[in-house]
């Protein structure tokens, strides 16, 4: 199958998977909602249009919620490109956010420098955490999927211990840290909304990751190892080092996303569970077909649905967890290798017949000229 046909098939496959996911969601909406029409309006239209006018506040909320899942989507994109199914994005997001929060509370700095240092340290912490499953994979041949999945819960419980017993603000009714210093916060692009300058950083990160993956030797090596690890090894590529590199880059991006989200959206650190951005990043990367430059568009789609489900919960009484159902169905059909395999086979046969007919026609023309 040629590149054009392959792209056409993948687009068709993605569209059908999303359509099925929306259809499944519609079934649940008709079961749960007292007014299905109102619920559908909240899900599909109200995120951008409310009462016949552009819903600017909601649009800015969507853009703000894109920020962390762009980072986790990029992280998963790099790791999956190397065929490393690392699932520690959840833990690294939380760890990056927690460490950044501690620096934002206890280490005073100048206003312009403070958030930068917090974000960079959060990114480093994320990268260091990802070394654990990466080294276990390379040195011990351990499954990076299992190691990273367990790492998420180790990180969660360690953070909860320190949050509850060491850094908690006892004057508050819930478990949370002391407020961040004003100098440490990531500034809002539009005051009073969830949209921060972290969104701009996320777009810059997208461009840099795209350049790294498609315009550098290291990016090429990561993609080659993902396609065929054995061939890459026999070709002289440093497979072990690149496997570690891909996962560390994923950790850096996830940790950075967690730090930006915490310092931009909250006044204190109050996560008491894994935030969910790591799992959403997997869906985003799958939708983008591991193409870094497509990550923001996939993130926009998920953030839009997320906002729609939130509005549906507020105004139509449908559980906001509907977004989890949609993501799960999308993941299911994208992960199923045999999904639409017959359609792919028909496209291959059709393309082959067309090529043969074209060659026969060219041969007939050449024979006539002779």
Predicted regions and their residues:
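Cytosolic-side transmembrane-helix boundaries in multi-pass membrane proteins
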Residues: 1-20, 26-30, 227, 234-241, ...
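Short loop segments and helix-boundary regions at transmembrane helix junctions
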Residues: 2-12, 80-88, 110-173, 215, ...
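Hydrophobic alpha-helical segments embedded in the membrane of multi-pass proteins
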Residues: 19, 66-77, 92-98, 124-131, ...
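Single transmembrane alpha-helix segments in multi-pass membrane proteins
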Residues: 28-34, 42, 47-106, 127-142, ...
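Short, non-helical or kinked segments that cap or interrupt transmembrane helices
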Residues: 34-38, 80-96, 138-147, 266-279, ...
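Transmembrane helix-bundle core of multi-pass membrane transporters
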Residues: 144, 148, 152-215, 322
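Helix-loop-helix "hairpin" substructures at the membrane interface of multi-pass membrane proteins
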Residues: 191-268, 292-293, 297
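Transmembrane alpha-helical segments in multi-pass inner-membrane proteins
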Residues: 248-328
């Amino acid at each position: 199958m040629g590149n054009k046909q392959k792209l056409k098939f993948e687009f068709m496959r993605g569209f059908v998977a999303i359509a099925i996911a929306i259809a499944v969601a519609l079934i649940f909406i008709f079961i749960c909602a007292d007014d299905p029409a109102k619920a559908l309006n909240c899900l599909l239209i109200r995120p951008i249009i409310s009462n016949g006018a552009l819903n600017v506040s909601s649009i800015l909320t969507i853009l703000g919620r894109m920020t962390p899942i762009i980072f986790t989507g990029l992280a998963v994109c790099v790791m999956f490109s190397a065929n490393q199914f690392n699932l520690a994005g959840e833990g690294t997001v939380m760890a990056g956010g927690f460490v950044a929060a501690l620096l934002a509370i206890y280490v005073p700095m100048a206003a312009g420098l403070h958030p930068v240092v917090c974000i960079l340290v959060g990114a480093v912490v994320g990268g260091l955490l990802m070394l654990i499953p990466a080294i276990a994979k390379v040195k011990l041949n351990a499954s990076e999927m299992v190691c990273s999945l367990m790492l998420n819960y180790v990180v969660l419980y360690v953070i909860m211990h320190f949050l509850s017993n060491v850094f908690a603000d006892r004057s508050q009714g819930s478990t949370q840290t002391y407020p961040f210093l004003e100098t440490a916060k990531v500034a809002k692009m539009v005051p009073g909304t969830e949209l921060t300058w972290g969104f701009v950083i996320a777009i810059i990160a997208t461009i840099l990751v795209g350049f790294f993956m498609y315009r550098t030797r290291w990016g090429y090596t990561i993609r080659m190892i993902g396609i065929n690890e054995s061939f890459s090894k026999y070709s002289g590529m440093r497979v072990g080092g690149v496997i570690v590199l891909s996962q560390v880059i994923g950790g850096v991006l996830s940790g950075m996303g967690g730090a930006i989200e915490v310092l931009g959206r909250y006044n204190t650190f109050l996560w008491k569970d894994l935030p969910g951005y790591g799992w959403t990043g997997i869906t985003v990367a799958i939708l983008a077909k591991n193409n870094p430059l497509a990550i923001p568009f996939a993130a926009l789609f998920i953030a839009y649905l997320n906002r729609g489900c939130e509005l549906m919960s507020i105004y139509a009484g449908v559980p906001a967890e509907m977004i989890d159902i949609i993501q799960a169905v999308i993941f299911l059909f994208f992960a199923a290798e045999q999904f639409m395999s017959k359609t792919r086979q028909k496209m291959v046969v059709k393309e082959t017949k067309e090529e043969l007919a074209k060659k026969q026609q060219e041969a007939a023309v050449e024979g006539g000229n002779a």
